[in-house]
Amino acid sequence: MNKDEIRIGIADLNVALPPKKLITVGLGSCIGIALYDSIKKIGGLAHIMLPDSTQFSNVSNPMKFADLAIPMLLEKMEKQGAVKRHLKAKIAGGASMFNFSDKSMIMDIGNRNSKSVKKVLGEYGIPIISEDTGGNKGRTMIFSTEDGMVEIRTVGMGIRAI
């Protein structure tokens, strides 16, 4: 890892300016949400684990949940000078990592995460301009704050820009 890379852990988020790159690994059923203000060149990345917090009575880490992490990321970006109407989103992850014959056993958390992220971004009026979701492989997301490009590295499938 070099000085221009910022690692985002699971149930974590951060905001950066050029020339920084925001990187998150281990996107299985989790979703990486990259938000970018191309005018101010401010980028933010969140790594969420679960679709929504409403089923939990005690939320120890709000960054685990799509419904709480996205507003937190927006607030952090706006404090850096980002303008919500300029934001565009790119998302990755949401895989079905376990091959159970009965999909309801795990309630397809990857698909539920993906739907929840899209719903929350829609509520904030943030368009998703690119995505790499679904499937059954883990991903790494590398987000450049220079130009908003997101590189996806998928296990056994190489590298793809979204």
UniProtKB/Swiss-Prot annotation:
<dbReference type="Pfam" id="PF03975">
    <property type="entry name" value="CheD"/>
</dbReference>
<keyword id="KW-0145">Chemotaxis</keyword>
<keyword id="KW-0378">Hydrolase</keyword>
<dbReference type="GO" id="GO:0006935">
    <property type="term" value="P:chemotaxis"/>
</dbReference>
<dbReference type="GO" id="GO:0050568">
    <property type="term" value="F:protein-glutamine glutaminase activity"/>
</dbReference>
<dbReference type="InterPro" id="IPR011324">
    <property type="entry name" value="Cytotoxic_necrot_fac-like_cat"/>
</dbReference>
<dbReference type="InterPro" id="IPR038592">
    <property type="entry name" value="CheD-like_sf"/>
</dbReference>
<protein>
    <recommendedName>
        <fullName>Probable chemoreceptor glutamine deamidase CheD</fullName>
        <ecNumber>3.5.1.44</ecNumber>
    </recommendedName>
</protein>
<dbReference type="InterPro" id="IPR005659">
    <property type="entry name" value="Chemorcpt_Glu_NH3ase_CheD"/>
</dbReference>
<comment type="function">
    <text>Probably deamidates glutamine residues to glutamate on methyl-accepting chemotaxis receptors (MCPs), playing an important role in chemotaxis.</text>
</comment>
<comment type="similarity">
    <text>Belongs to the CheD family.</text>
</comment>
